[in-house]
From Swiss-Prot:
EC annotation from Swiss-Prot or TrEMBL: 3.6.4.13
GO BP terms: nuclear polyadenylation-dependent mRNA catabolic process; nuclear-transcribed mRNA catabolic process, nonsense-mediated decay; rRNA processing; termination of RNA polymerase II transcription
Protein name (Swiss-Prot/TrEMBL): ATP-dependent RNA helicase DBP2
Chain intervals with Basic and acidic residues compositional bias: 18-36
Region annotation Disordered: where it falls in the sequence: 1-54, 490-544
Organism: Candida glabrata (strain ATCC 2001 / BCRC 20586 / JCM 3761 / NBRC 0622 / NRRL Y-65 / CBS 138)
Location relative to the cell: Cytoplasm; Nucleus
Domain Helicase C-terminal span(s) in chain numbering: 331-491
Length: 544
């Protein structure tokens, strides 16, 4: 029996887009009764109208048996998938660099039709013109649709948002409708406002046929509009941990209806110090929920969080757990002094600007450096804007939109401001200042070379960065990049006859950007100063 058959049997037709929603009227009455009787789940120590109160963890041992049941297993294996041999499955996983952990793991799918999504979901997917599922989606969809707790480990830009968004829509459509005062059914926690907004766009796009409402809750802006949307009711809430805690403590929403929980970029949330807030939030959610954790890395802190809050999880990992950079990215490292950086930067901008569609993301270590670089570039006629923590939310939104649309194709950012930013078509990443650790280096350069595209990462390495030398060499070596001779003095590995990989920057190999005859490649050259760079009066054309 497929999804639609199963949903037909649940008797409750919902006018929302003509889909069949699960649940009996008695289920809704149960929820209403719980609320009217002072149901303590997601409760506060004090009345909602008394102002902020401390959240208290419900006594789940006594409360859980009295909660209304819910459905979370909707997966019906497609006949083609069912007939796929173990050898074929193993070969597919090997080719996809896929590692799985756990028991009773469903076989991967290879097409959208094999996933078994209802027609209303498939229609939205195909309307977007997607060719085929990504590797994480091939295994993640059957896992999520099966109702299992799961961990997905994959690089940023691998399609993980749809891996949990589409099953979440199916999950919502099988639950009782929201009643006045109910909180969300699906809760997505994300580390930054920018990522939360990006997730909301995907949820809106694919949930519109079901008329599923969503809202995004994040800090840095007035709370009024967010409060109104929460009170009006939304099946999906995407939130940053801090602002959600504020809303819960103020009694503006509750988590008693949450049965599908997503922790997106769990590693980044922990890096940013959100672990106490995450634990406080998750403690408010019924423990028999379905929980999906997504992460680009698998450090011990994330593993501990999974052990504490996931029940018998299954895990899929794309690629190696060892820290590695995408092989779609050409890494160019220049060993320079501090005062050489600006001239080197302009040289690379001259080259990159030959492509009018180029977008360049420049990382600086401090807000002051960020502003100084931007001011210097703008005085020289370059269309650059800065984004960092001292900018108010409205200005950050404007800068990001200018960068995304290409009106200002150069953006200078700090790490904190850039976290969660998902902009398509970034061709170049420049580490004007190297980050403090190798994990941030990999995360930074991963803003280019996404979704099968190629990109270039340029890094200025100074003597102050010597502590990163060995790990940087290791990352470049794994990706078969050309390592400059000046950097090799930091190598901890014994020098063999071929310590550096051939090709690449300045050696007549792949060349700048990976193409034959590119910058520094055979037959290459910088060319003129046309492209996207602006004149000082703000127009397009050659710089003066």
């Amino acid at each position: 029996m497929g999804y639609r058959d199963a949903l037909y049997n649940k008797t409750n037709y919902n006018s929302r887009g003509g889909d069949f929603r699960g649940g009996r009227s008695s289920d809704r009455n149960d929820y209403n009764r719980d609320r009217n009787q002072g149901y303590s789940h997601g409760g506060l120590r004090g009345r909602h109208d008394d102002g902020p109160r401390e959240l208290i963890k419900p006594d789940w041992e006594s409360e859980l048996p009295n909660l209304p049941p819910f459905e979370k297993n909707f997966y019906v294996e497609h006949e083609v998938v069912r007939n796929r041999s173990d050898q074929e499955v193993a070969q597919f996983r090997k080719e996809s660099e896929m590692t799985i952990t756990g028991h009773d793991i469903p076989k991967p799918i290879t097409t959208f039709d094999e996933a078994g999504f209802p027609d209303y979901v498939l229609k939205e997917v195909k309307a977007e013109g997607f060719d085929k599922p990504t590797s994480i989606q091939c295994q993640g969809w059957p896992m999520a649709l099966s109702g299992r707790d799961m961990v997905g480990i994959a690089a940023t830009g691998s399609g993980k948002t749809l891996s949990y968004c589409l099953p979440g829509i199916v999950h919502i459509n099988a639950q009782p409708l929201l009643s006045p005062g109910d909180g969300p059914i699906v809760l997505v926690l994300a580390p930054t406002r920018e990522l939360a907004v990006q997730i909301q766009k995907e949820c809106s796009k694919f949930g519109k046929s079901s008329r599923i409402r969503n809202t995004c809750v994040y800090g840095g802006v007035p709370r009024g509009q967010q409060i109104r949307e929460l009170i009006r009711g939304a099946e999906i809430v995407i939130a940053t941990p801090g602002r959600l805690i504020d809303m819960l403590e103020a009694g503006k929403t509750n988590l008693k209806r949450v049965t599908y929980l997503v922790l997106d970029e769990a590693d980044r949330m922990l890096d940013m110090g959100f672990e106490p807030q995450i634990r406080k939030i998750v403690d408010q959610i019924r423990p028999d929920r379905q929980t999906l954790m997504w992460s680009a890395t698998w450090p011990k802190e994330v593993q501990q969080l999974a052990r504490d809050y996931l029940n018998d999880p299954i895990q899929v990992q794309i690629g190696s757990l060892e820290l590695a950079a995408s092989h779609n990215i050409t890494q160019l490292v220049e060993v320079v002094s501090e005062f050489e950086k600006r001239d080197r930067l302009v040289k690379h901008l001259d080259t990159a600007s030959q492509d009018k569609e180029s977008k360049i993301l420049i990382f600086a270590s401090t807000k002051r450096t960020c502003d100084e670089i931007t001011s210097y570039l703008r005085q020289d006629g370059w269309p650059a804007l800065a984004i960092h923590g001292d900018k108010d939310q409205r200005e950050r939104d404007w800068v990001l939109n200018e960068f995304r649309t290409g009106n200002s194709p150069i953006m200078v950012a700090t790490d904190v401001a850039a976290r969660g930013i998902d902009v398509k078509g970034i061709n170049f990443v420049v580490n004007y200042d190297m980050p403090g650790n190798i994990e941030d280096y990999v995360h930074r350069i991963g803003r280019t070379g996404r979704a099968g595209a190629t990109g270039t990462a340029i890094s200025f390495f100074t003597e102050d960065n010597k502590s990163l030398g060995a790990s940087l060499i290791s990352i470049m070596r794994e990706a078969k990049q050309n390592i400059p001779e000046e950097l090799m003095k930091y190598d901890r590995r014994p020098r063999g006859p071929h310590p550096r990989y051939g090709g690449g920057y300045g050696r007549g190999g792949r060349g700048y950007g990976g193409g034959r005859g590119g910058y520094g490649g055979r037959g290459g050259g910088r060319g003129g100063r046309g492209g996207f760079n602006r004149s000082r009066d703000g127009g397009w054309g050659n710089r003066r």
